Amino acid sequence: SGFSTLVRLKEKEDPTVGRVMEWVKTNRTLASQIDSARVVMESMASEITPCAEVVYKGQAIDKNKFSVIPLGDPHIGLQTWSKEVGHDWDLKIAKRVYKKVFTRLLARSPDTEECVLLNTGDFFHADNIAGETSASAHKLDLDGRPSKWLEVGFQVMQMFIEMCLTKYKSVKFYNVPGNHDDILGAALGVFASILYEKNPRIEVFKGQSPFQYFHKNKVLLGFAHGHKCKLGALPGKMADDQYIMWGNSTHRHWITGHVHHNQWIQYKEWSGASVESVGIIPPKDAYAYGGGFGGRRGTQLIVFDDRVGEWDRKRESVLETD
């Protein structure tokens, strides 16, 4: 913070003050930057032409069951080199692999009337033209320019949503904020809400809150990225945020991302709720590979019965042929 002054050059004999303008410099918080960016994004998104209504081709069998598809940290824009980390990955590969894996997953999953499509955060790998995260300014391994990440990212988002709209009668898209893409992640939710505003079968939760909830009959689900709140504190957070839903439910569960692997060792039943983290499809970047982080690459679909909780779970792994 401080002052900046614009001055006018003057002759030595000129008695007038040379100051033309003075303004205060401030250190804006990340939150205020994101709020400003959201206003700009909503203005830009207003120019988007909403797409035509997607045709439903599914066969809903049991209205008591619903499907939840967690998109574990897609990291669109990530680039890796096989000689360094064991696998090649870029925008072109990401688009191809996501389509193949998601197609196989939906083909072997049961038809339910309702689907919850969940972005667990970090949909984009970086957040600005410098190729960094906005919150921590971490330098990242990236493929191409920001406009390319946006284009491919929105195409992948559209593919996920429209495949779900084709299979399920009702779709809810939850966009959870991550730690890699504070601004571009917010853009994803804004653009999706406008793109599908003429599709009455989808409801878009744009992602203003780091903690989001879905409630149906006796099941209460919580969604978070997992970088701000320790897993053990999430059940209490759910009870505090949604005390009415908490009291009306008997099966309560959190789904998080961030750690890039299925946390079955830490899949625990805390007081009143269970918590898990889901794996991801992209390979490890150089930082994660060097640190020995990460896990098996793949995704999953969880079927819940609104009377008894989790009913079934389908897994789909990334194949070498993908």
Where are these regions (language model features)?
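Short, solvent-exposed loop/turn segments at secondary-structure junctions
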Residues: 75-76, 124, 180-182, 228-229, ...
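N-terminal short leaders/motifs
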Residues: 7-16, 158-175, 252-261
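Acidic, histidine-bearing metal-coordination/catalytic regions of metal-dependent phosphoesterases
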Residues: 1-92, 99, 107-111
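Short, solvent-exposed polar/charged micro-motifs at secondary-structure junctions
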Residues: 16, 184-186, 213-217, 286
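Conserved beta-sheet core of the metallophosphoesterase superfamily
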Residues: 165, 194-201, 208, 215-222, ...
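Core catalytic region of metal-dependent phosphoesterases/phosphodiesterases
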Residues: 54-57, 61-74, 82, 87-202
